[in-house]
Amino acid sequence: VNLLLDTDVLSEAQRPAPDLKVLGWLDAVDEDRVFISVASIAELRRGIALMDDGRRRAALAAWLADDLPTRFAERILAIDRAVAEHWGDLMAQSRRSGVALSVLDGFFAATALAKNLTLVTRNVKDFAPFGVTLFNPWGE
């Protein structure tokens, strides 16, 4: 099974006091089967840009610029045509059904569906209505 990490999983590992269950899961998983989306890079960059200047912001900016791209290298997934088509269908489904799906969450769901990946997230309720295979490393 190949996996797509939602931004919340990436962020958890960088928290000052991360959830040990999530860290244990990340340590145990075969990293060659773990992918991230460019949407996570956008979401993380936005979050860092909104932080006040300081050591934490600088450390996270360095992690995003250097560590993350090195760690995931060829496993950073772009929004290609297949993802875009799935995204369009998902956003239409969201609107028709009245079940909210944010633009970024739509890209995570579309990437998981287009690439046949299990989406690893804490926010399973946000994705469950859209047919995405999900895993919650928090075990909730």
Tell me the role of every PLM-derived stretch:
Residues V1-N2, A109-E140:
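Acidic, PIN/NYN-like endoribonuclease modules and their adjacent C-terminal/linker elements
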Residues V1-S40, A49-D66, K125, E140:
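Short, well-structured N-terminal submotif of metal-dependent ribonuclease cores
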Residues E12-A13, W25, G47, W87-L90, ...:
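Residues that scaffold the ATP/ADP-binding catalytic core of kinase and kinase-like folds
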Residues A17-K21, V103, L119:
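Short, conserved clusters of charged catalytic residues that mark active-site
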Residues R46-G54, T70-T118:
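Active-site neighborhoods of divalent-metal-dependent phosphate/nucleic-acid chemistry enzymes
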